[in-house]
């Protein structure tokens, strides 16, 4: 409709008249709105519709190829990181690389022609944001590839993102400060006054054009119609009316779970309404994109850097990276206040941080955060979250998730996150019931389908429902290309525990022999799948864990000379898996008691051999079970007397480690858990000692099996202690 000469052309760009610039600014806002709508379709489990929208936009003359490329990159990034499959990651990387290149060209073009599409920021700022977003997502994919060459390139990309984000963030802060001064002084800047159209006596203000229109433009009906169309697109997106769903307000709940869904009022509201008072209806599309994009990217970047192990963190510090977990979380929270894809990705990141399978904020380390005085800070804002709220967002996080559930009713991704939140609160049965409420076969996004089944299996083992957990996990062999070795081993461990429960009389089943046969077959053949059907060129950390465990089981069978291979397995391996996925913090008292019984009362030749390494694993898990049951001192005594002395001692005031390789994850983990015991026993007075234990955990080894998972948890705990000391 509005062809702007020079856009999309390779030749030198001529200067544009104000009328041409106005048309270009509106076209840019339109294309960004179209891209935001496309990405929202994906978040509602309708990727085909979203990609079709982008195809339609690409086919139009003078469309904004940059935001379209980024939108495709974001869609493909979500698909790649949800499933970690090689082809998906390769495709996303190529698209994001294209978005990077286009962003630099678009930024240069906007600067040359002076295209001021924001009342706050200089020309080209929005493309600086698309560049940093493309760079950051591309770098994350490079890191996930575990190629040394790709990782080196990723550091360079992260560095570029980091510095440009800092620059843009400073521009935002300066612009906000200037805006406040103008409001205080009562002055008005014509350059930042929204454009006003006058037709037939009525006036319409367009916030997307950040300057006064000429008299001719004010009466241009085509220009007015286009501005009104963009306003309508934005209004529909902010209220959730843009992707074909009924009003979200009718689905908005105040509580989690299926019961709250059943308790929704029967009378329906027919008008679409925004779900949050935080949404600014008067904000221009480009300004919204800049704010939310910078907050999301810089926030996630800082949180990730803050969680990295000291060795890597030290290297990054040398090249200028600094990560503040608290500041990063605060920025991500700001991003979630925007009703766009940045807000949604920010919420997914927060859900993973607070309530994900690894739960970086350990429930047992419930230290109250100190409230630091920020009243004198120039950059402080009234709406910023304080330390305690960042640590335990509680209902704020719950309400943010429930808004997304209302806005995207067709997406299993948000339902999965609600189930994870229920699980994090110990409401395991409700979590499973919620996941059962959806027909998994109808989930369009294959990666989300895989995650749903995997999470349900994990939750089921916390409930000791091993039969169904095994069925779920084995079904992933036909759906996911992640790690067939781990899926097979996991299922075998489930059948092993069922067989043991039958042996102990805790479970009556005519399938006892079947459980035995399946456990033996799946556990011992799982290693044959290593290196196959996995997204990386080398085995995953969990794959290496499986290989070591199975080799241990085989060696013990040979050593003891037992006929049944299962008699060569001492501590039940399913309890290790449960620990890796935070099961001990989520089990009820009933399920913790059953865990304790299975760990302490089952007998077989391998257990009776009292192997030192197997006893260490058993005693570590028993100590955690006792702590969660409230027997804190008893659990601590087991850790001090039976676990720590096997690899750790203090001689003449100096820490001495005995380097062991039998179960590498267990040793730093035991030191980490010892810090939590000190906190539980001594409270705030014990924080200095807790920090000592955490530093010992961090110093145990530079690299070990599952070091990333354990190391991030330790680093997050150290940051929490430092904040409270």
UniProtKB/Swiss-Prot annotation:
Phosphoserine: residues bearing it: 246, 377, 380
Provenance organism: Saccharomyces cerevisiae (strain YJM789)
Major localisation: cytoplasm
Keyword check for Transferase: no
Record-linked Pfam families: Iml2-TPR_39
GO cellular component: cytosol; mitochondrial outer membrane; nucleus
Protein name: IML2-like protein SCY_3392
Stated role: May be involved in mitochondrial DNA stability.
Annotated family: Belongs to the IML2 family.
């Amino acid at each position: 409709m509005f062809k702007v000469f020079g856009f999309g052309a390779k030749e030198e760009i001529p200067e544009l008249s104000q009328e041409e610039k106005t048309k270009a600014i509106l076209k840019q806002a339109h294309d960004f709105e179209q891209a935001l709508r496309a990405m929202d379709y994906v978040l509602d489990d309708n990727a085909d519709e979203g990609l079709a929208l982008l195809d339609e936009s690409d086919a139009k003359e003078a469309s904004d190829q940059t935001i379209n490329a980024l939108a495709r990159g974001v869609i493909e990034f979500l698909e790649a990181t949800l499933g970690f499959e090689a082809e998906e990651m390769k495709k996303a990387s190529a698209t994001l690389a294209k978005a990077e290149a286009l962003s630099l060209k678009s930024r240069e073009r906007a600067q040359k022609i002076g295209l001021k599409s924001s009342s706050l920021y200089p020309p080209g700022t929005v493309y600086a944001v698309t560049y940093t977003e493309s760079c950051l997502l591309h770098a994350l994919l490079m890191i996930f590839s575990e190629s040394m060459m790709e990782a080196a390139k990723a550091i360079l990309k992260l560095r570029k993102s980091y510095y440009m984000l800092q620059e843009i963030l400073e521009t935002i802060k300066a612009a906000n400060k200037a805006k406040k001064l103008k409001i205080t002084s009562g002055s008005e800047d014509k350059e930042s006054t929204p454009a006003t159209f006058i037709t037939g006596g009525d006036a319409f203000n367009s916030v997307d054009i950040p300057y006064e229109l000429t008299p001719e433009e004010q009466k241009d009906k085509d220009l007015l119609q286009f501005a009104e169309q963009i306003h309508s697109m934005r209004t529909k997106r902010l209220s959730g009316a843009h992707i074909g769903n009924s009003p979200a307000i009718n689905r908005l709940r105040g509580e989690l779970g299926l019961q709250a869904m059943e308790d929704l009022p029967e009378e329906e509201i027919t008008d679409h309404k925004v779900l949050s008072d935080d949404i600014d209806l008067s904000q221009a599309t480009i300004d919204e994109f800049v704010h939310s994009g910078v907050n999301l990217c810089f926030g996630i970047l800082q949180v990730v850097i803050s969680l990295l192990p000291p060795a890597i963190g030290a290297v990054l510090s040398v090249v200028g990276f600094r990560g503040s977990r608290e500041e990063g979380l605060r920025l991500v929270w700001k991003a979630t206040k925007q009703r766009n894809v940045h807000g949604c990705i920010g919420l997914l990141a927060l859900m993973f941080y607070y309530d994900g399978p690894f739960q970086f904020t350990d429930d047992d380390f419930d230290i109250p955060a100190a409230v630091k005085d920020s009243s004198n800070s120039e950059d402080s804002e009234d709406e910023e979250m304080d330390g305690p709220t960042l640590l335990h967002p509680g209902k704020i996080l719950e309400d943010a998730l429930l808004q997304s559930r209302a806005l995207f009713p067709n997406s299993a991704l948000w339902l999965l996150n609600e189930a994870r939140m229920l699980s994090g609160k110990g409401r395991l049965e409700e979590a499973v019931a919620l996941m059962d409420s959806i027909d998994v076969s109808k989930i369009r996004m294959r990666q989300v389908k895989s995650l749903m089944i995997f999470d349900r299996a994990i939750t089921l083992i916390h409930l000791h429902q091993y039969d169904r957990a095994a069925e779920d996990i084995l079904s992933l062999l036909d759906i996911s290309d992640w790690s067939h070795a781990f899926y097979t081993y996991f299922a075998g461990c489930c059948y092993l525990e069922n067989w043991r429960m039958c042996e102990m009389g805790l479970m009556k089943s005519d399938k006892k022999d079947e459980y035995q046969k399946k456990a033996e077959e799946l556990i011992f053949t799982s290693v044959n799948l290593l290196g196959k059907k996995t997204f990386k060129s080398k085995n995953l950390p969990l794959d290496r864990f499986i290989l070591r465990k199975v080799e241990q089981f085989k060696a013990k069978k040979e050593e003891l000379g037992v006929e049944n291979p299962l008699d060569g397995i001492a501590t039940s391996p399913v309890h290790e898996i449960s620990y890796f996925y935070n099961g001990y913090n989520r089990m009820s008292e009933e399920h913790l008691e059953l865990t304790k019984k299975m760990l302490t009362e089952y007998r077989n030749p391998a257990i009776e051999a009292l192997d030192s390494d197997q006893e260490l694993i058993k005693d570590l898990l028993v100590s955690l079970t006792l702590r969660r049951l409230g027997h804190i001192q008893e659990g601590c005594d087991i850790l001090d007397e039976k676990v720590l002395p096997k690899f750790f001692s203090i001689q003449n005031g100096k820490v001495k480690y005995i380097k062991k390789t039998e179960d590498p994850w267990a040793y730093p983990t035991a030191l980490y858990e010892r810090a939590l015991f000190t906190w539980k026993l001594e409270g705030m007075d014990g924080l200095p000692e807790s920090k000592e234990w955490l530093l010992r955990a961090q110093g145990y080894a530079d690299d070990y099996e599952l070091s990333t998972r354990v190391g991030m948890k330790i680093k997050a705990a150290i940051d929490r202690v430092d904040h409270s000391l």
